[in-house]
């Protein structure tokens, strides 16, 4: 229980940091002007082939697949499987946390890394570069590299798939198929919406797969080695471990 509390606190803090970087801190963190403005020829060619006339619709659909459908599949199926396979005497809520936290950790920590890259690189979004008429500058104009939607959905799909594999879940094929199907659809829609270039979503997808596979393993190994736990202390909580 103390270890679960520490993990939940850490992933919640990461989630809040991400939300802050997307809201109150975004103006201060994003580049005022693009640092990477001109796309390579292959990006421009793919963009011309895939961009939709109705970019707003593609953007809306990518948000639905990326922020609604993918989490429902990745976390929802994992939670349902955990609840239905709780051992006798085991806490159902504890089992759900144990199985869904690796997924949440992979997403939250990888998204912080994505934000750091986006703000540092300052790549101009294609919708800004190819706009027929210059629009009002915004804090979302120069965060094209690399795609956060793609990284998120592939991290969700991969980490959920790995949890299902670890438990020998009969739902594993469904988790992989639905998760990667939604992730691939989301990546395509980000290009169709003119929000990202093909290289943005390709690297975002690869990063998400790597994060979904590696982060839960690395974090679990670190915790086992150092015995990290969040324990009650006078006036609050303390982080205990062996180093």
Model-derived features with residue positions:
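Interfacial/capping segments of alpha-helical transmembrane domains
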Residues: 25-42
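Membrane-helix interface/capping segments
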Residues: 83-87
